[in-house]
Curated annotation (Swiss-Prot):
EC number, UniProt record: 6.3.2.2
Protein's UniProt name: Putative glutamate--cysteine ligase 2
GO molecular function, one term: ATP binding
Gene3D superfamilies on file: 3.30.590.20
Function in brief: ATP-dependent carboxylate-amine ligase which exhibits weak glutamate--cysteine ligase activity.
EC class name: ligase
Keyword Ligase carried by entry: yes
InterPro entries, alphabetized: GCL_type2/YbdK_subfam, GCS2, Gln_synth/guanido_kin_cat_dom, YbdK
Substrates-to-products reaction catalysed: L-cysteine + L-glutamate + ATP = gamma-L-glutamyl-L-cysteine + ADP + phosphate + H(+)
Amino acid sequence: MIDSRADHGLRFGIEEEFFLLDATDLDIARTAPSGFLEACRAALGEHFAEEMFECQVEVASPVFADLAQAARFHGRARQRLAQLAAGFGLRALCVGTHPFADWRRARSNPAAHFARLFEDQGRVARRSLVCGLHVHVEIPASHDRMVVLQQVLPWLPLLLALSASSPFRGGRRSGLASYRRALCGEWPRMNIPPALPDEDAYRRHLALLRESGCIREDGQVWWMVRPSSHVPTLELRICDACPRLADALCLAGLFRALVGQALLAGDAPAGPAARDACLEENYWQAMRHGCAGRYLVDGRCVNARDWLERAWRQCHPQARQGNEWAYGHAQRLLEENSADRQLQRYQALRAEGRGRQAALRRLVEELLEENLQALPAI
């Protein structure tokens, strides 16, 4: 049960991305029907946004003080988006990759901002038919966001492992728990951030990238975690979109606790050589194996459950406050995350005698059901 009492922790926000599907065949929609985007803007206001493909949209939250507020907002937003989509012959699906969609069918958004992305990144952008979960946590002005970033960075593969929801690509098993992150790796500036010591160094780095023509704007630094370019937050970007809202809330709470611990600790992060040596391997383990990965932590090889327990023990009680439900839910996620569940259901459906396409369609139906699953009591 999520504690609905307002805690005094860090304020945060959540962004969820969705695929738009044709309701008849559950494949990605070629384009949004006339009037659909306008209806979404009217219903969701500033919290609704288009994405880089015409078959994608995003819901971005207001600022929350606790997880119960986030649950109420996103629960209602998911329901409203589903209702609006149904009225236009669509379905809205929140998941890292669509299990059987062909990325070559997706139409790029012609808006100028997205057109520049496709011009700059070419086929890399065209292939990136993926949905993510982004979490913003507010950083007080008295703290340096890059120092906080370097401290939470080593824990991020654990959050990816918990969120992994993209084991399929184009109707085939990808062999990865998070194929989305493999696609992210094709982009520049989208994986592990460099070991910049503080925000002054970060601003100098951005200036160099702009002056050299590598980026058009600061927002084109898309690391797995980054200082936001428009609000005073640290933005988590590593996680796959979560079919179950409860999983997204869990990840937001865990990230919030880790940021809170970094703010309380105030210690300098580990040296970049030691950090990168284990971080790269742990990132691969999370991408490939998810919660079944073997992780290098403090000179030892541990499983995801041990790593989660270490992360929680490290957090001061003040950092844990208001996030206890997230830790409890994460323990359950370790038993079966979305990638595990999708693979198991696909195998079971094939064992029942369904063909590959029929099994994949049924899997999408079940993911759509998960998107609107009732939350634990709040």
